[in-house]
């Protein structure tokens, strides 16, 4: 007999190392936090300047939701 990886002709599955690297790459944000969600950031910042932070919770929360969707933990 020869030294085959498997007797039934199937190739064994690859090690789990590449999948771990791919999983961590998927969870890491692709942008810097300052550059993510420019639309909600602009609305949030303009509202805070004009009306104060307490009056802009809707825009602040919308920006946080957008950042979380981009992979940031805020």
UniProtKB/Swiss-Prot annotation:
**Sequence ranges assigned to domain CHCH in this UniProt record:** 34-74
- Induction (record text): By copper, salicylic acid (SA), nitric oxide (NO) and infection with P.syringae pv. tomato.
Motif Cx9C motif 1: which residue numbers? 37-47
Biological process according to GO: response to bacterium; response to copper ion
* Keywords associated with the record: Chaperone, Copper, Disulfide bond, Metal-binding, Mitochondrion
Q: Which GO terms describe its molecular function?
A: copper chaperone activity; copper ion binding
Disordered: region residues: 1-30
Q: Which GO terms describe its cellular component?
A: mitochondrial intermembrane space
- Positions occupied by motif Cx9C motif 2: 56-66
What family does the database annotate?
Answer: Belongs to the COX17 family.
This chain's function reads: Copper chaperone for cytochrome c oxidase (COX). Binds 2 copper ions and delivers them to the Cu(A) site of COX. Can complement the yeast mutant cox17.
Protein name, please? Cytochrome c oxidase copper chaperone 1
Q: Which organism is it from?
A: Arabidopsis thaliana
